[in-house]
């Protein structure tokens, strides 16, 4: 077989399309691999078709950015790069790996991914990794979900100053849980009198905090979901005790006081009027939702609260139609599960998604208490983890196994011959 490629001898990376094409001249490659001008045909064989959300951005992004450039650059400066990533995901612009069938010698392109949390495909994979990280860290005990919310009057602050305000929100949740556990604060009245309480906690909780910036209707609504272990570590670091009683009224009032005090410290006297209005309007504190039950299936609980932490605000299966100008999507209202349909122009849809774009390297999932890896007692507490969780379940998140699991198809087997394909070479980004 003189015209076939001896892929076992290939051990290089092609840096441009012409080098790649020249290499295969005289060999048995599909004539559709290249366009007439010699460029790589992005639609050849297994190049992934553009997803619907990526398609909407590709068709309308330039117009939207030109019209809203000042606002986008001010509030979401990483938007242009992230949008270009999702448009290029899985296509030739990010490069690809090429595999050859040793029987029929057909070739398959597997496009490189953008690895952006804003991408529906890569964001979902990011979420799966986060779920596995938490499952491997969490102790073999009951956990409970608590949701910390705030009134809509404060939402604009958290949009305009995202990183600073969201960090304050996380810190308020952390202080609230620790203060409830240790009675660091009693009432707002005593705080105003500056009564001192011991800042050294007698107990340490363990919990994961997850940022959600939207509800099912995609409106801006920043809030924190918490999965907390029904355990507390004693001050002498020797014993863990059960902790399964949560005073929800106290949580609501405590969270309000701590959050407003932190915001006041950050924003200064200009926030005093708003703070006083908040105390008058919300006398019972901010709404803290905490079901009086635990997650018996902890994995289900983790998957539930992480579903929005690593992907765009909407999944493509919720988009009912797109006619090139308007997007219609659906959702079930969280309160009564009533079905709703919403139609937005493409520009409105794009701007809605951009509201929830997370800044570079910003952590939307955080570990607190004895779940922090830097906690001095972490090595002792790790003994409480179910032994099964020591197994490396991340292997199931690898590309090949993920495709097998969800689509019952091996991407590295020839669709014609059903034999395992062999790695041929790689085209790098910019080639």
How should each PLM-predicted stretch be described?
Residues 1-431:
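Beta->alpha loop/short-helix hinge microenvironment recognizer with preference
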């Amino acid at each position: 077989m003189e015209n076939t490629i001896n892929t076992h001898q290939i051990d290089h990376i092609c840096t441009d399309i012409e080098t790649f094409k020249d290499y295969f001249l005289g060999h048995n490659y599909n004539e559709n691999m290249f366009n007439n001008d010699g460029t790589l045909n992005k639609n050849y064989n297994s190049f992934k078709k553009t997803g619907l959300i990526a398609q909407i951005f590709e068709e309308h992004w330039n117009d939207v950015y030109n019209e809203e450039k000042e606002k986008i650059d001010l509030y979401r400066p990483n938007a242009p790069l992230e949008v270009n990533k999702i448009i290029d995901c899985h296509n030739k612009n990010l490069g690809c790996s090429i595999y050859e069938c040793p029987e029929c010698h057909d070739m398959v392109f597997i496009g490189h991914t953008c690895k952006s949390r804003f991408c529906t495909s890569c964001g979902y994979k990011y979420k799966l990794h986060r779920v596995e990280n938490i499952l491997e860290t969490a102790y073999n005990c009951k956990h409970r979900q608590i949701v910390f919310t705030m009134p809509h009057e404060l939402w604009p602050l958290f949009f305009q100053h995202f990183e600073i305000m969201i960090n304050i929100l996380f810190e308020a949740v952390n202080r609230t849980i620790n203060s409830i556990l240790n009675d660091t604060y009693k009432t707002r009245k005593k705080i105003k009198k500056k009564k001192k309480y011991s800042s050294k906690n007698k107990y340490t909780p363990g919990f994961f905090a997850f940022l959600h910036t939207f509800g099912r209707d995609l409106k801006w609504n920043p809030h924190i979901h918490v999965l907390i272990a029904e355990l507390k570590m004693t001050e002498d670091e020797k014993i863990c005790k059960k902790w399964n009683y949560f005073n929800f009224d106290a949580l609501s009032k405590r969270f309000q006081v701590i959050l407003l005090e932190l915001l006041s410290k950050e924003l200064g006297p200009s926030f005093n009027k708003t703070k006083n209005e908040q105390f008058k309007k919300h006398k019972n504190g901010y709404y803290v939702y905490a079901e009086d039950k635990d997650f018996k299936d902890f994995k289900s609980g983790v998957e539930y609260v992480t579903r929005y932490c690593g992907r765009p605000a909407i999944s493509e299966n919720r988009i009912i139609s797109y006619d090139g100008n308007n997007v219609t999507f659906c959702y079930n209202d969280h309160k009564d599960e009533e079905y709703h349909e919403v139609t937005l122009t493409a520009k409105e849809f794009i701007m809605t998604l951009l509201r929830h774009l997370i800044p570079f390297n910003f952590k939307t999932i955080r570990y607190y208490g004895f779940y922090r890896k830097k906690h001095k007692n972490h090595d002792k507490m790790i003994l409480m983890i179910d032994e099964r969780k020591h197994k490396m379940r991340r292997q199931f998140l690898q590309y090949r196994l993920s495709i097998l699991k969800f689509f019952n198809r091996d991407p590295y087997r020839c669709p014609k011959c059903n034999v395992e394909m062999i790695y041929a070479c790689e085209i790098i980004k910019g080639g």
